[in-house]
Amino acid sequence: TEDIGKDVWEKLIMVAAIGSIMCYSNMPAKEVVKNKNYLNILKEMIIEMENASISINVNIKKNYSKNTLDYILGRADELHSSLKEDFDNKRPLEVDEILGEALRTGLKNNVNMPNCKKVYDELIKYA
């Protein structure tokens, strides 16, 4: 594809958001989406990371956040996360390489990312 940055960011956001919230909540995706608090954190994380990508001029798809959340809601029963698998098996989490990358990008460019930061700060203990 022409815009590799866009594809990378769209995948990064999806993987970072769902994997991180599953670990943070210690729930499978299908439970996360039934929990108002965790679902809201998930939604906000997606928006925050989208804003981080926009801050470095990534031409992310219009309605990316909404479409990503809809995708997660529609497939919550079958969504799998290698991050959660590592968490469940007490293996070190690659949270710094995934969520951390988005968080650092946003913060460096003055993007407000309170939900990403809260989740990152909790999960980095397991890295």
List PLM regions with ranges:
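Short hydrophobic "helix-edge" motifs at membrane interfaces and signal-peptide entry regions
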Residues: I4-K6, L79-H80
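Active-site-proximal catalytic alpha-helix in oxidoreductases
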Residues: G5-V33, N37-E50
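NAD(P)-dependent Rossmann-like dehydrogenase/reductase catalytic/cofactor-binding core
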Residues: K43-A127
